[in-house]
Amino acid sequence: MAGMKSSPSQDEEACVLAIQLATSTVLPMILKSAIELDILNTISKAGPGNYLSPSDLASKLLMSNPHAPIMLERILRVLATYKVLGCKRSELSNGEVEWLYCWTPVCKFLSNNEDGASIAPLLLVHQDKVPMKSWYHLTDAVLDGGTAFNKAYGMNIFDYASQDPQFNKVFNRSMAGHSTITMKKIVETYNGFEGLKSIVDVGGGSGATLNMIISKYPTIKGINFDLPHVVGDSPIHPGVEHVGGDMFASVPKGDAIFLKWIFHSWSDEDCLRILKNCYEALADNKKVIVAEFIIPEVPGGSDDATKSVVHLDAIMLAYVPGGKERTEKEFESLATRAGFKSFRKVCCAFNTWIMEFSK
């Protein structure tokens, strides 16, 4: 283009990146197959530092296709390129070279941990045919207004999930795995639950989050607050009372109110309605504990944390009317506008930030 000059080496690098971006659907779809084939769990079970060949893997997975080892090799190569797996060269007795593959820290989070939780279901839900269809409507949403998912299905993703049992199962499994991993880290890292007599989890679903908190702090009374049809099917947890209601109408009283990944699904106006109800439910000097992703003020960051939250913001753009990830300043503004006297960013757990809004 006129006025834009670059060196041959810069052109080489830029064109290679453009080609990588043009083929970027490869990685999530390869990961999807690796998860469905149980490749990552199988390699993780071998343990750190223990390597498997494609033939070993095909044998462990009981694959009858004679071409499976060759096909697995090509899948494993992609995963090793993105550091999902480690690899090393091995020379066979006949002089041929074989590549062996092993566990990495990234693989740890994409395979089942000791609690049976994994980030893998989160990947599967975003590659599922249901939400994938919405991306084909994003251009129209930008041009005409509205949300891509609603244009694809005539309703929002939450209403759709309630009508599609199979997708609802995939969706709930993805949220449960991500939540379990993140909450375990929050409970280990954040000490703001200490000394509380009671805590209300707004939008707490089945009560699993409160159960993790109260397992560490058994003297706290937990109130799991969600829509009546949600809490009506929730399991019994020691120290947890299930309460049905609408967070846009009122919120139960407690020493603290906890909201995890709630605000990114709502517009600023809706967030303010929720926060004002939380404010009314708290005594003076009590707090709302917010767990959310924080998007950087300045675009263009290339670190993994920034890429992750920018991806999530784009997902909100496509799936949820009014939903978005927010900057620290935007959270502070919401707290101030809702009447809270102080805002504090406390700590981070796997890119989810804990913030306190104090009355």
Swiss-Prot record:
Upregulating conditions: Constitutively expressed.
Q: Which GO terms describe its biological process?
A: methylation
Q: Which residues bind S-adenosyl-L-homocysteine?
A: S179, G203, D226, D246, K260
What's in the keyword line of the UniProt record? Methyltransferase, S-adenosyl-L-methionine, Transferase
User: Which pairs are disulfide-linked?
Assistant: none
Catalytic reaction(s) noted: a 5-hydroxyfurocoumarin + S-adenosyl-L-methionine = a 5-methoxyfurocoumarin + S-adenosyl-L-homocysteine + H(+); bergaptol + S-adenosyl-L-methionine = bergapten + S-adenosyl-L-homocysteine
Amino-acid positions noted as binding bergaptol in the UniProt annotation, renumbered to this chain:
H126, H264
- EC number(s) stated in the UniProt entry for this protein: 2.1.1.69
What CDD domains does the record tag this protein with? AdoMet_MTases (cd02440)
* Family annotation (SUPFAM superfamilies): S-adenosyl-L-methionine-dependent methyltransferases, Winged helix' DNA-binding domain
The record's listing under InterPro entries reads: COMT-like (IPR016461), O_MeTrfase_dom (IPR001077), Plant_O-MeTrfase_dimerisation (IPR012967), SAM-dependent_MTases_sf (IPR029063), WH-like_DNA-bd_sf (IPR036388), WH_DNA-bd_sf (IPR036390)
Chain ranges passing through the membrane = none
**Mind listing the GO molecular function terms for this protein?**
5-hydroxyfuranocoumarin 5-O-methyltransferase activity; O-methyltransferase activity; protein dimerization activity
Origin organism is Glehnia littoralis (Beach silvertop)
Q: Which family does it belong to?
A: Belongs to the class I-like SAM-binding methyltransferase superfamily. Cation-independent O-methyltransferase family. COMT subfamily.
Gene name linked to the record: BMT
* Documented activity regulation: Inhibited by Cu(2+), Ni(2+) and Co(2+).
Indicate the residues that form the catalytic site: H264
The protein's name: Bergaptol O-methyltransferase
